[in-house]
Amino acid sequence: MNRRTFTRASICASLGLAVAPSVMASQNIFKKHQFNLKYAPHIGMFKNLAGDDPIDQLNFMADQGFTAFEDNNMGTRPISLQEKMSAIMQKRGLEMGVFVAYKDFKNPTLAGGKEEARSDFLKQIKASVEVAKRVNAKWFTVVPGTVDLRLAEGYQTVNVVESLKQASSILEPHGLVMVLEPLNWYRNHPGLFLRESPQAFNICRAVNSSSCKILFDIYHQQIQEGNLIPNIEKCWDEIGYFQIGDNPGRKEPTTGEINYNNIFKYIHKRNFNGILGMEHGNSRPDKAGELAVIEAYKSVDSFI
C-alpha cells in the first residue's frame, strides 16, 4: 500500500467508511474532479485529511483536481520550504497564486505620503520579487494601509498612486503583478484606505501599468458595496485576481447569501484564465467539513 492509498484508507476509517483500499480510487469521495476555473486552496484548508506537512497538503489538493494554490504567508516561510513547495507545485501542475507582499492594517503608510514609509514599501516589493522567482508566482497582494485623517482623500490618492507607480517600475521588467485588495469597513477592516472596487479601478487606471491590478475579493465587496456582477463587469479590465468567501461567515460557497454559481458562470463566460483564491475558512472544522468544502466547489462550479 503506497502513501496515498494509506492516507485514503485512514480517511475512510476515520469517517466510518468501510471501503477497500483497492476500490477507493473509484469512489466519488476521491475521484479527481475537473474544475472549470482555477480555484486555489491554501495551507491548512485540508490539514485533517492530508496532515500537517505542506507537501502532503499540496499533493492532496492536486489529487482532488485543484490546479492552483495560494499562500498568504509564503514570503515568510523558510527558503528551503519555498523551494520544496515550488518543486512539488511544478510536478503536480499547481499554479502559484498570491502571497502577501505588503500590508499595513494600522498606519496610513502609503496614503500619508511620507518618504520613509514609501521607501519601506518599495523595499518589501523588491524582496517579494525574489520570493516570486523562487515559487514561480506572478501575483502578490498589496494592502496600502489606513486612511490619513489629516489629509483630504484626493491628496491621499495621489500619494498612493505615486508609491504604486514606483513599485510598478520595479515589477514590470520581471512580468510580475501586484494586486490591490479593497477590504470592507463594516465587518473586518474599518479605516483602511482601499475599500471599494471603483476606488481600486480609479487607482489602477491612474498608475497605468500592467504590474498594478485589482484583487477583487468577492466576500469583501459583497459586504462593502454588493452589486457584485455589475461591479466585476465595470472593473473587468483592471482585475487580475479573485478571492472567494461566502457572507456572512467567510466560509466556503453555499454557506451564505452569495450566488457563486452565477458569479463563476459570468467569470468563466468572460474567459478568465487567472486564479480564484479560496481565502475563507471551513464551516466545519473536521475531515467531513473538509470534504464538504470540496463538494461545495464541485457544486458551484457546475455552471456549464
Predicted regions mapped to residue ranges:
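Active-site acidic/histidine proton-transfer and metal-coordination neighborhood
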Residues: 9-18, 29-33, 91-92, 110-213
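Glycine-rich, proline-tolerant flexible connector loops at the mouths of alpha/beta enzymes
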Residues: 70-90, 144-148, 188
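Catalytic domains of carbohydrate-active enzymes, especially glycoside hydrolases
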Residues: 56-74
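Active-site-proximal loop/turn and secondary-structure-junction residues that shape catalytic pockets
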Residues: 45-47, 75, 102-105, 146-148, ...
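Catalytic-core regions built around general acid/base machinery
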Residues: 84-91, 166-170, 231, 262-266
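Mid-chain, structured segments of secreted extracytoplasmic proteins
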Residues: 83-115
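Histidine-acidic metal/acid-base catalytic patches
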Residues: 2-62, 136, 194-216, 220-304
